[in-house]
Amino acid sequence: MRDTDRPGGGGLPRRTLLLTGLAGAVAAGISLPSAAPASAATRTAGTNGWPFTSTGISTLPVPGTPASVALLEGDVSTVLLHVVRRFHYEVEEVARHELAGHRPAAGLTGHTTNYASGTAVEIRPAAYPLGATGVLFPPQLAVVRDILKECGGVVAWGGHLRRPHAAHFQIAVRPGDPRLRGLAQRIKGWTQAPGQGAGVLTLGA
């Protein structure tokens, strides 16, 4: 692959996606698929423990972008919208129809079952399809790692799966985990304070 190749156009060149394998997946809080993963037809909750629902789901605009996405309202949407905003500003711009969120559970397996609870989002899924490698340039990957670090284990990334899914971000804690509320409150504070939050340039950083 040439250095001049671009992932989905308009972004930094493609490079080999650096994966951390099994250890990275465990650290990120994503359950790796078993030999015979249960389908959504035999379960009532996603792999992250959140129940399937069509209640409390809203299609929400992502501030600073032309895009919107269907997510579970409340702390979940606050956190995932923040992730999308940082991705848009720091990794790759997100166009109007380049997000996918809540969807019916039928046919979903493994980590994708979390879409049915509104607790996961795909960012530019056509550019970063399931199983694809070489879709992020190292500086972009560094930003993704920084986003995960900022979220303190509350958010997991599909790039750490054995079969990578770089478009996928999900809530990685169970319902009621206080870390989710704490992170959501911090994000709300950042968005209300001048000079903080996604998209803010920090000089000298």
Regions found by a protein language model. Give the residues of each.
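N-terminal secretory signal peptides
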Residues: 1-12
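C-terminal segment of N-terminal export signals and the immediately downstream linker at the start
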Residues: 32-51, 55, 204-205
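Catalytic cores and adjacent binding grooves of peptidoglycan-active enzymes
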Residues: 115-118, 130-205
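Active-site acidic/histidine clusters and adjacent loop/turn architecture
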Residues: 44-89
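Second-shell loop/turn segments in exported
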Residues: 64-71, 127-135
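Mid-length scaffold segments of soluble, non-membrane domains
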Residues: 91, 104-132
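Surface-exposed patches in mature extracellular/periplasmic domains of secreted proteins
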Residues: 90-99, 154-161
